[in-house]
């Protein structure tokens, strides 16, 4: 099915919800990782529609650990979207972590701020991977929740805060200027115009450190901009 054996292995790991059986991702070169990702996304596109894009490694610390000075990008497909308030099983993921993000809805009339929760996942054992590994491994995607678009001009909002709770207990809180999220669209300037879609959802990077996802009722409260929730079951 795939030209590259790594693509076949990652596809199988995703389908079977397991870690890869190959050597560490350090053996992957960037050009090969990009080619693997192209193969995998082409296969996903045959069964699920493109709905948006994600930006990964948006903070300086993660970029430094990956040896890069810019985020990586990855397409989001419809099978990765879950509805606000839905239940989701841990059996769907290998090593999931939760992130709360400023999402964007980019359309012909402008840009809307959108609350976003991303469940990141990794098919390399112990999350030990390099930048090429992250790119090849579906951009570390697990699932996404996007809320309703926030009314008003994003330029008029100076800060968005989020508090993440599990079963009513605060796990983390964070904040960011949405102007920084909008500015990151420059890394998607080609992608947002090449596929003919009139609207895209964009996950722009986490406001918090990734939290290991356990069973329970999770809420990401973005204050006046609304909240997102999900029930995680075993």
Specify the residue positions occupied by each region the protein language model found:
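Catalytic-core "active-site belt" of small-molecule-metabolizing enzymes
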Residues: 2-193, 214-215, 219, 225-234
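Conserved metal-binding segment of the jelly-roll/cupin
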Residues: 196-211
């Amino acid at each position: 099915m795939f030209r590259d054996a790594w693509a076949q292995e990652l596809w199988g790991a995703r389908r079977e919800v397991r870690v890869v059986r190959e050597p560490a991702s350090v053996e992957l070169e960037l050009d090969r990782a990009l080619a693997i990702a192209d193969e995998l996304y082409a296969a996903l596109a045959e069964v699920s529609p493109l709905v948006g894009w994600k930006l990964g490694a948006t903070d300086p610390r993660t970029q430094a650990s990956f040896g890069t000075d810019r985020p990586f990008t990855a397409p989001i497909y419809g099978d990765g979207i879950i509805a606000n308030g839905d239940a989701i099983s841990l059996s769907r993921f290998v090593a999931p972590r939760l992130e709360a993000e400023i999402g964007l809805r980019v359309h012909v009339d402008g840009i809307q701020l959108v609350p976003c929760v991303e469940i990141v996942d990794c098919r390399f054992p112990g999350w030990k991977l390099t930048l090429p590994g992250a790119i090849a491994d579906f951009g570390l995607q697990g699932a996404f929740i996007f809320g309703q678009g926030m009314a008003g001009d994003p330029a008029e909002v100076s800060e968005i805060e989020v508090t993440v709770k599990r079963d009513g207990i605060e796990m983390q809180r964070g904040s960011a200027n949405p102007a920084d999220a909008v500015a990151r669209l420059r890394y998607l300037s080609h992608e947002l115009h090449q596929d003919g879609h009139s609207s895209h959802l964009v996950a722009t990077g986490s406001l918090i450190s990734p939290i290991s996802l356990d069973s329970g009722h999770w809420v990401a409260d973005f204050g006046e901009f609304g909240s997102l929730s999900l029930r995680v079951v075993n």
